[in-house]
Amino acid sequence: MENSRSDILLIGMPMSGKSTIGKALSEKIKYTFNDMDNIIEDKYKRTASNIFETLGEEQYRLYERECLEDFSGRDKLILSTGGGAINDKSIEISLSFKYRIWLQASIEELIKRYVDDEKERPLLYNTNNMEVVLTDLYRTRETFYMNCSNIVMNTSSKTINQITDELITKIDELN
């Protein structure tokens, strides 16, 4: 994976594995891992849910775009985005990352992961029908993910190690 620049952007739905895979991949290839939501929370001294509640989703998306701009073009960096970070206002800057990996998982898998991790995500969805919410979000975001990514990886029914090994192979194939 030797290149003049080798930044990696991880995109996909909430619970598709962006943070988990990003951390594991960074350990294997010795890149710096950054989580967009954590960066925004640290920078603005507020939780993501508080920003959404008080300033609105549009403001949060602006913060995400700033984060993409700040981290684009860095060498040996992995940036895990929020699920909605790739949109009509950010797609252009997203394309400046060398490797843009779309982590996919079925809606059923996303729901299972949410149930398994609900204590960590209590404010993620305020709904009685998560399947409908996730399906609607996916339909809204799928085109952006597709147009942004140059690597697609299904994360359902695979171990973290299998996913990271497959990603390293796919990255090497692009070189």
Regions found by a protein language model. Give the residues of each.
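NTP-dependent small-molecule kinase module
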Residues: 1-5, 24, 28, 112, ...
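P-loop (Walker A) phosphate-binding loop of NTP-binding proteins
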Residues: 13
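A glycine- and Lys/Arg-enriched "phosphate-lid" helix/loop adjacent to the NTP-binding pocket
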Residues: 97-142
